[in-house]
Amino acid sequence: MQAEQEIVVLSNGPGELATWVYPYVTTLRQRVGSRVRISVVMVPCPHASGHEAEIARRYPVDRVLPVREFWRLLITKTTASGWDWLPRGAVVFLGGDQLFAVLLAKRLGYRCLLYCEWQARWHRWVDVIALRRPQPVPPTRAKVAVIGDLMTDVQTLAPEAQPDLRQMLGLAATTPLVALMAGSKPNKLKLGLPLSLAIADQLASATPPIPCVIPVAPTLTLESLSRYADPTDNPELTHIAGTTAQLYQPTDGLPYLETPQGTKVYLWQQLPNYPLLRQVAIAVTTVGANTAELAALNVPMVVLLPAQQLRVRRAHPWDGLAGLLVALPAIGRHWTALVFWVLVAKGLGWRRFWQVLQAPDIDWQLVKEGLGYKAWPNLWAGQEIVPELVGPLDPQAVAEQLIHYLDHPQELAAMKVALQAVVGSPGAAASLVELTLSELSVGKE
């Protein structure tokens, strides 16, 4: 059946693709089959990895436009691959700058829908505003609906794990698994992977040993990941109490990184990785979209913010001029440290911040208080429901905290309940699909 209508999904980064686009387009495809053509258009974003189009092509969509062609599309309505456009359609904003969705909808003559987690902008020029949670919206002609969190639908879309990782590794069904999620970008992996491997060493020496697995980000190959565990390729290993590892890719079984201590950290490449994450007892992760994905699956986690990154990290989650300056090679490292401490000072107040600076040893608990919450579930809840560890992190101390949780399953169960409460119930994707199809019907008039 030839499609008669077009749905153009705008997005910008791996996190938005995994937590917003994937549930939406999967639900949409199940609902409409081939009656509607689904196009994904990647928009400019300073935090994008450059591999977003490749990730989106794995989803049930008809075509994907990489970010390098976005401006040509917006200005000329054409693409290098000669895309055509159906007479009726809708542009659905699922990440990036909301203005891009407004402008592209005007250019194509389509309806415009915004999914808004925090704040709706350009409300006078859109047709539908779908809100994650109730929030004030200025008077507008747009239809406004509260639909919930798209990420909750990950729970229903994630199939049960087959095969079970424990079976593949010959482990007992009751063996707890720990997921190590060190990130997908160089600025996080340079320190995150060596630290994760050192944590795995500590867990392997526990009684009984606790196996670890790394869900490999879709933007990484095994070879590119392993380079961050090689001191020749990653000189930042000297900045953290991490360890090295060597990559092994056996013909039978999962590939793995092996540390000098002999610890094997298994590498999981199946995408989406939700079936694996459902198997783990707890995850160790950096800040970012990982915390939102884990929360959507109700997976307990410990979130790491290593202070060692102040000396080497150039890219970070803050937007604006500071984000651009941090990316400059000449001043990046010093500016990152400056921005970090300014944020701490802003959160604590200058008087308390001055006390932190004057103390012989840094009070990292105060620093953490000044930074505020960084993990998404904590931001949503307004309180710490998953632990955030800030400071010059010690792999042994992190491992001990993980072992504590594994030895106290009631605490893990309570964390799961808290995550489920803050994320909410599934159904947002279906609601957004119905809003979209309703607008397509309006477009027929």
Regions found by a protein language model. Give the residues of each.
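Nucleotide-activated sugar donor-binding and catalytic core shared by glycosyltransferases
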Residues: M1-E445
